[in-house]
């Protein structure tokens, strides 16, 4: 039983990561229009915070929709949000 739980946890995390990447890609253009003029002169930590702040509403809405359409358990919504936000930030700061 323990091995089964570990496998389910690993595959569930992988599924969340894939979904987070898809959600991040789907809202990337909308977020880029909000941050494109401001992050060039910022330090990396400052730019990460700026992107996080400007992307918040868009990402939360997209994650909520994706979670409903993909039957993500409510207990995993916050993890999906965290993974998606990280993907968005990484994509904008590269």
Segments the model singles out, each with a brief description of its role:
Residues 2-94:
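Protein-protein interaction and targeting regions used for scaffolding, dimerization, and localization
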């Amino acid at each position: 039983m323990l091995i089964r739980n570990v496998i389910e946890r690993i595959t569930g995390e992988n599924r969340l990561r894939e979904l987070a990447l898809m959600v991040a890609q789907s809202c990337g253009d909308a977020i880029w229009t909000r941050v494109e003029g401001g992050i060039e002169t910022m330090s990396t930590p400052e730019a990460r915070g700026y992107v996080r702040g400007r992307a918040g509403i868009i990402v939360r809405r997209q994650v909520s929709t994706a979670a409903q359409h993909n039957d993500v358990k409510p207990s995993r919504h916050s993890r999906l949000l965290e993974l998606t936000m990280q993907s968005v930030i990484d994509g904008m700061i590269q």
